[in-house]
Structures are given as C-alpha cells and as structure tokens.
Curated annotation (Swiss-Prot):
Entry-linked Gene3D superfamilies: 2.40.30.20, 2.40.50.100, Bovine Mitochondrial F1-atpase, Atp Synthase Beta Chain, Chain D, domain 3 (1.10.1140.10), P-loop containing nucleotide triphosphate hydrolases (3.40.50.300)
Record InterPro entries: ATP-synt_VA_C (IPR055190), ATP-synth_a_Xtn (IPR031686), ATP_synth_asu-like_sf (IPR023366), ATPase_a/bsu_AS (IPR020003), ATPase_F1/V1/A1_a/bsu_N (IPR004100), ATPase_F1/V1/A1_a/bsu_N_sf (IPR036121), ATPase_F1/V1/A1_a/bsu_nucl-bd (IPR000194), ATPase_F1/V1_b/a_C (IPR024034)
PANTHER family according to UniProt: H(+)-TRANSPORTING TWO-SECTOR ATPASE (PTHR43607:SF1), V-TYPE PROTON ATPASE CATALYTIC SUBUNIT A (PTHR43607)
Family matches, as PROSITE patterns: ATPASE_ALPHA_BETA
Source organism of the structure: Neurospora crassa (strain ATCC 24698 / 74-OR23-1A / CBS 708.71 / DSM 1257 / FGSC 987)
Top enzyme class: translocase
Name by which UniProt lists this protein: V-type proton ATPase catalytic subunit A
Length: 607
C-alpha cells in the first residue's frame, strides 16, 4: 500500500516537502510518482534541481543553485520532465551557464554581475524573429530528423536547418510560408493516426540522452588545429576523442583555446567546466576580435561558437550538467550535417563535482575518493563523439570531436581521472611540466604522446599531401634517435660521437626549436596551415639528407656546418612567413630555398 499523500497540489502537479539539506544535496519527502532525473523546483525561490536517487517516497535531489536559506518543510515542485536544453536558431554567438541559462540576458534583467537565485530566463530569445524558408509543402510525408525549413542564422553559418524532433512523424497538414517568425511560433502541423501535432522552430532534448543517428561511420577526415606538433605528429580526425592532460601552467587552456579558434570545424562548443573565471573572460574578449576567412570575407570566430561557462565559484552540481549540456548542443549541430568540435576544460573538475556529490550521498568511495562509476560516466560522455549519418532526409553526415583537458594534481598521469580517460580516448596530447618551465610551448612531450588515427588518415594524406606520412615517420624516428644520443652525450661528451650522429643531434635541436615550438601570440605562428607544415618538414629533412650524403662522401661535418650557416638561418626563419600572404607566394619562396640548398650542397661536395 502506498504511503498516504499529504502534500499540496500546484496547478494539478503534486508537490513534496524538504526533509533535509546538505550543501547542494536536498532530500525531499512525499514525492510518490517522481521519476529518476526529473527536473524539480526546490524551495520558495524555485531553485532548479534534478532527482538523482529515489527511496520509498523520498527523493534525493542535486540542486544546481546555491541552497543557502532553504529550510526543512519548504515545498518541492515537480515539473514532470527531465533536465532538457532548448535547441534552435540563436544558440551561436551566445554564452550560457551549466544549465543553459543565457548569462547576457540575466545580466540585463538583473543589472547585477551575479546570477539571482531562482531566475528562469529562456535559453533562446523568444522575441527575436528569424527569416524562415520552408523546404517542404502540405501533403508531404515527414519523419524524425527530416529538414522541413531553413533559417538564416548569421553571416558565418547562413543555413541553419530546422529539423523535426527524432521521435515525430506524419503528414504535413500546414506549414508556414516564407517569412519572419519567432522560435516558439507553431509554424508546422503534422497529422499521424488522426492526431494533429504542431511544432515550432525550436525543440527541447533531455541532456542525458544521446541524440539518435541513422548509423555511425568511421571517421576519415583530419581534425586540423593549426599547431604544427599536433597536426604533423599526433593528428586527430573529425569525430575523434582527444585528451590533453597536464599539470598547472603547462598550457592546456591555451591549446584548447587555439583549437577552438583555428580548427577546421564548422561549429565550436566551448565548455569552461570548473576552471578560472578569467579564462572564460579571456575567451569572451578574444573571440569577437579574432576573425576567420569565409568565402573571401572576414568573420569573427564568435559567430560559430557557443560558450558554456561554469566557473569554479558557480554551484558544484551544475558542473556535471554543463558537460552534458555542451555535448547535446554539439549533437544538434552534428544532426544538421556539420563538423562540431567540443572543448571540455577541464574534465577533472567535473570528476571532482561527481566525487563531492557522491560523498554527500554516502556512496562507497573508490580510488582517491572518486565514485566507482567514474570510468562509466567518462565513457558515456566520450562515446557521444563520432562521425554519423544523421536521421532523416536529405542525407547528411556530421561529426562531433571532443577535446577534453584533464588537470591531474601535480601532473601525475596515474591519477584515476587521467587513467580512466586514457582508456577511452584515441589521441593523447601529453603536456610536460619540464618543457613548460623551459618556455617550450606547446609543451607536448613527443615521447609519451600518441595518436591511434595515423593509419586511418594515410588515405587522406595520399590524396592531398603524398609526402606527409613519410616525412612524419622520419621526424619521429629522428626525435627518438636524438633522445638516445642525448644520454650518450651526457656520459662521453659530443666530441666522441660520429659525424652522422652529430647531424642527427643538430637537426633534432633545429626541429625542436623551430618546428615543434610555436608562438600562439604572434600573427605568423598562432596558426600554421597544413601546407606550410609540410614544406617545413620537407626542407628540414631535405637538409638532413643532403648533410648525410656529404658526410658519406668524405666531408667533415664541422666544415659542412660552417659552409651552410646561411641555409640553417633560413631553415630557422621558415616559420616567420605569415600564412595570410597566400599559399602560392610562400610556396615559391620555399621552392627557392630548396633549390638553393641543393646548389649549396653540390658546391660543398665538389670542394
């Protein structure tokens, strides 16, 4: 027999009462019929919360806002729906908090730099009108995921496809004409089994449920980020998963910001999860100023970006939600047939939020106090990446790439979050504290980093840049040989080495200082296109090969090195060419250097 219901009713929905409060975790009683992960409003301020455990008529709720002032006996209002995000025109060029409340709108409404408690501002602007163009007509059959109209979003993404929710279907009985409408106006009516349903341009989707796709494809296009060391040695694919673990001050945030600024994705979702507020402020300041070229005109990068800010002083529980909010927004753009990159900075703070809530729930702690289900939670997040065939027609392919920064305490890669992440992701960009202290940025440790996508991408390289895989393998071999030689030099000194080994060491130094290092704050080096990377590899390895040939023909390396000082200076200044001058002009300069190198070595060998 069910316990007697003694709670009040508001608008026909049963309300419970608060039984206990412990930080962000609230226990409510008299909650018969509540569902797991249902959205509830807690207390008189109607704070947003989510049910995470049910025991009899008691429900445990994690509250996404500050719970100060909430008392035992306060009402808990059920909404009857899960925590969901609004998806539609207006997501781009916007900044939200972890549960998709628009921060700019809240600032305008409250005239405060703080978010008032219990504020309920819709995520998408309800007043703004969008230019809608229908792509279907009355009488057409329509199924989940079909594109039934397009909207002009902004000058960067001119076609925002309007999709039917995945579980809907039927025959169109009414569709609006071309014109301007708001996101909540019902502009489509569909009939199925005699029942008519109306749809607006926007749709809602529960954040914990992955959006369905027709089928998953294997990824085969590279995810280029404009950092030479990453594009050349450890590339990822569109739809790949990347982890960037590193101690404090190693440059994780600079790498993830440069990935979001310069990657070849169509849309960027940047989730600042439990990191410093200054970093989000920096993104907000930098992105509108930075531009990227689209069809011959410059557009600010902010127009292709959605920011989700959940800084370290915001409520802990909302950190967990922010990651899911971000990935759901990314999946929505993926379903339109776009390549989306999602940055999560940092997943360690997310895991710490899980640990805190798990501790308050009294769950059994596992390694370092993290919950036993940490690995499963991380996997369920990273597995939402990938390249898919979207639902519905017309057929379209889209992808979600996830780049997760991990901050292990003290840079210890055996930390549970790092080790769980490395078991899931396919690309590992390991940052090294020693390199960062030497001001070698990006501080990627080439001996521990890896990418499992190299063989998948070989077909693309064969088609576009045939020499690339060979040059990449040779540079990796050269770097690993130089590490072994470094140990020999420490024991017996450089003079004891043979000439070919001296060349290897000198070339490795040149590659480390002038190829792997990159100044993210300069106009010539903040972004390096793949053709420039290939030419730099070609010229540096060309110098290495010519030098080895000269030694094989009896020359002395010291003499050869002195005779080719000017060539080495040119190799060191290859990176100073500004990509915006144009590929053709810069490639001609590089070809001239290549010819000069061949002539110089020919004259050195003849001496």
């Amino acid at each position: 027999m069910a316990p007697q219901q003694n709670g009040a009713e508001v608008d026909g929905i049963h309300t419970g009462k608060i039984y206990s409060v412990s930080g962000p975790v609230v226990v409510a009683e008299d909650m018969i019929g509540v569902a797991m992960y249902e959205l509830v409003k807690v207390g008189h301020d109607q704070l947003v919360g989510e049910v995470i455990r049910i025991n009899g008529d008691q429900a445990t709720i994690q509250v996404y806002e500050e719970t100060a002032g909430v008392m035992v006996g306060d009402p808990v209002l059920r909404t009857g729906k899960p925590l969901s995000v609004e998806l539609g025109p207006g997501l781009l060029n916007n900044i939200y908090d972890g549960i998709q409340r628009p921060l700019e709108k809240i600032a305008e409404a409250s005239n405060s730099i703080y978010i008032p408690r219990g504020i309920a501002t819709p995520a998408l602007d309800r007043k703004k009108k969008w230019e809608f163009t229908p792509t279907m007509k009355v009488g057409d059959h329509i199924a989940g995921g079909d594109v039934w109209g397009t909207v002009y979003e902004n000058s960067f993404i001119s076609v925002h496809k309007i999709l039917l929710p995945p579980r809907a279907r039927g025959t169109i009985t009414r569709i609006a004409e071309k014109g301007e409408y708001t996101v909540e106006e019902k502009i489509l009516e569909v009939e199925f089994d005699g029942k008519k349903t109306e749809y607006p341009m926007m749709q809602t989707w529960p954040v914990r449920v992955p959006r369905p796709a027709a089928e998953k494809h294997s990824a085969n296009q590279p995810f280029l980020v404009g950092q030479r060391v990453l594009d050349a040695l450890f590339p990822s694919v569109q739809g790949g998963t990347v982890a960037i673990p590193g101690a404090f001050g190693c440059g994780k945030t600079v790498i993830s910001q440069s990935v979001s600024k310069f990657s070849n994705s169509d849309v960027i979702v940047y989730v600042g999860c439990g990191e410093r507020g200054n970093e989000m402020a920096e993104v907000l300041k930098d992105f509108p100023e930075l531009s990227i070229e689209v069809d011959g005109r410059k557009e600010p990068i902010m127009k292709r970006t959605t920011l989700i800010a959940n800084t370290s002083n915001m409520p802990v529980a909302a950190r967990e939600a922010s990651i899911y909010t971000g990935i759901t927004v990314a999946e929505y753009f993926r379903d339109q047939g776009m390549n989306v990159a999602m940055m999560a900075d940092s997943s360690s703070r997310w895991a710490e939020a899980l640990r805190e809530i798990s501790g308050r729930l009294g769950e059994m702690p596992a390694d370092q106090g993290f919950p036993a289900y940490l690995g499963a939670k991380l996997a369920s997040f990273y597995e939402r990446a990938g390249k898919v065939q979207a639902l519905g027609s017309p057929p379209r392919e889209g992808s979600v790439s996830i780049v997760g920064a991990v901050s292990p305490p003290g840079g210890d890669f055996s930390d549970p979050v790092t080790s769980a992440t490395l078991g899931i992701v396919q690309v590992f960009w390991g940052l090294d504290k020693k390199l960062a202290q030497r001001k070698h940025f990006p501080s990627i440790n080439t001996s521990v980093s890896y990418s499992k996508y190299l063989t998948i991408l070989d077909k693309w390289y064969e088609r576009e840049y045939p020499d690339f895989p060979r040059l990449r393998d040779r540079i990796r071999q050269l770097l690993s040989d130089s590490e072994e030689l470094d140990q020999v030099v420490q024991l017996v000194g450089k003079s004891a080495l043979s000439d070919p080994d001296k060349i290897t060491l000198d070339m490795a130094t040149l590659i480390k200082e002038d190829f792997l290092q990159q100044n993210g704050y300069s106009d010539y080096d903040q972004f390096c296109p793949i053709w420039k990377t290939e030419w730099m590899m070609k010229l540096m390895m060309g110098f290495h090969d010519e030098a080895q040939k000269a030694i094989a023909q009896g020359q002395n390396w010291n003499k050869v090195r002195e005779a080719t000082q000017d060539l080495q200076a040119q190799l060191k200044s290859l990176k100073f060419e500004v990509p915006s001058e144009g590929q053709e002009k810069i490639c001609k300069k590089y070809e001239a250097i290549q010819q000069q190198m061949l002539d110089k070595f020919a004259s050195v060998i003849d001496e």
